């Protein structure tokens, strides 16, 4: 199948596009986008990959599925376009960065600046029906994004995989911990974060310390 995705990713996971599950997934997604509002916009479905080529990946932050309200989803986990009100989870991410690194709250929730530095902001499910969380789960996206995680683990070294919440933490089994660092905590959503285990996890400083120990330029969070 002809899927528009950044070329280095095509070289590493392009074989997925010809598998039956992906053909079925593509047909499902096309039908959904024709029938009902879905997010993100079609041109941004593979935004995480297109903004962060395979060879540039340093950090992987795994989310579950896209924001499902108008104007929010942009193909990057946790990110919202410039001018959009910060969702609660993103506010808590920025609060932790502020406490951890002293970086002030940014003016925008657009995390493209992270992606361009080598942070793969990967949702396990890349599309969603408007107003219906998890509506495109178990249609094939998870198999595709698991393949991406596996090939990153296999073909690269010294990556930092950041897993927030039970769903993301279930992906730890796909990652070779002899070559990579996994940072885990509860999810930054208020429901989880306010029970403890989110604030003070120091994931951003710990991530950068690991990168620097391995001669890799740290992320400007």
Stretch-by-stretch model annotation:
Residues 3, 15-163, 168-170, 175-176, ...:
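A polyanion-binding, active-site-adjacent surface
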Residues 1-13:
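Generic N-terminal amphipathic, Lys/Arg-enriched alpha-helix
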């Amino acid at each position: 199948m002809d899927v528009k995705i950044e070329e280095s990713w095509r070289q590493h996971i392009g074989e997925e596009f010809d598998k039956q599950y992906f053909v079925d997934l593509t047909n499902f997604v096309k039908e959904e986008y024709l029938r009902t509002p879905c997010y993100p916009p079609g041109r941004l479905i593979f935004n995480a990959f297109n903004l962060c080529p395979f060879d540039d990946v340093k950090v992987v932050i795994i989310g579950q599925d896209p924001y499902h309200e108008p104007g929010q989803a942009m193909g990057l986990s946790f990110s919202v376009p410039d001018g959009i009100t910060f969702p609660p989870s993103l506010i808590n991410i920025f609060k932790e960065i502020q406490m951890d690194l002293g970086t002030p709250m940014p003016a925008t929730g657009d995390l493209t600046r992270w992606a361009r530095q080598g942070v793969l902001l990967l949702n396990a499910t890349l599309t969603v029906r408007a107003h219906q969380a998890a509506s495109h789960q178990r249609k094939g996206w998870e198999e595709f994004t698991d393949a991406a995680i596996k090939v990153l683990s296999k073909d690269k070294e010294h990556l930092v995989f950041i897993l927030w919440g039970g769903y993301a933490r279930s992906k730890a089994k796909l990652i070779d911990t002899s070559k990579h660092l996994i940072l885990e905590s509860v999810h930054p959503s208020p429901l989880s974060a306010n029970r403890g285990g989110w604030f003070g996890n120091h994931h951003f400083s710990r991530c950068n310390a690991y990168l620097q120990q391995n001669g890799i330029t740290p992320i400007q969070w």
